[in-house]
Amino acid sequence: MKALTARQQQVYDLVRDHISQTGMPPTRAEIAARLGFRSPNAAEEHLKALARKGVIEIVAGASRGIRLLLEESGLPLIGRVAAGEPLLAQEHIESHYQVDPALFKPSADFLLRVSGMSMKDVGIMDGDLLAVHKTQNVRNGQIIVARIEDEVTVKRFKQTGNKVELLAENPEFKPIEVDLREQGLTIEGLAVGVIRNGNWS
């Protein structure tokens, strides 16, 4: 790694601290305001310099698209998942949250942004971050993250022989029925906790 100038180190430290405190990178405007730059464009130039030196990666098209390459600690947050790609593929990781995985039992391996209200009756709401322990060993009655033909879903697991039911916790949603002889089902992990609006629950 090339040495950073004093100003570049300030920008890097700000990005790292902002991620540590809020779970997400700052915007260019926030960097400019904190460090007294005249415009977000000045912040962008410093970020590009840091990217050239290999300490960050700039993710195109995202206002908070900054990824630390030196010390990307914490739990990866999985956003939109592309068809045919592993759930934890780099391009699915929106950011990292500075959360101790050991706070969950069993320990969490990643966070998944919940979409929809199918699990609202157990307190899992649209937009929540679901802490997930990566495993394929699950038991009936547990809440799991599953992938069916590239659709990722959070449901309660029930298996009888070759038949699996993925049960919603909302009477407005019907169970998803899977015949393992005819359809692919991948267990991505076990739900071990929920973060709502940055708070534990």
Curated annotation (Swiss-Prot):
Catalyzed chemical reaction(s): Hydrolysis of Ala-|-Gly bond in repressor LexA
Q: Which Pfam families match?
A: LexA_DNA_bind, Peptidase_S24
State the Gene Ontology BP annotations.
DNA repair; DNA replication; negative regulation of DNA-templated transcription; proteolysis; SOS response
Protein's UniProt keywords contain GTP-binding: no
Site residues by UniProt (Cleavage): 83-84
Name the InterPro entries on file: LexA, LexA-like, LexA/Signal_pep-like_sf, LexA_DNA-bd_dom, LexA_repressor, Peptidase_S24_LexA, Peptidase_S24_S26A/B/C, WH-like_DNA-bd_sf
What residue ranges does this record give for the DNA-binding region? 28-48
Check the record and name the CDD domains matching this protein: S24_LexA-like
Q: Which residues form the active site?
A: 118 (for autocatalytic cleavage activity), 155 (for autocatalytic cleavage activity)
The family line of this record is: Belongs to the peptidase S24 family.
* This protein's name: LexA repressor
What is the protein's species of origin? Answer: Photorhabdus laumondii subsp. laumondii (strain DSM 15139 / CIP 105565 / TT01) (Photorhabdus luminescens subsp. laumondii)
> Could you read off the lineage of the organism from its UniProt record?
Bacteria, Pseudomonadati, Pseudomonadota, Gammaproteobacteria, Enterobacterales
Which gene carries the instructions for this protein? lexA
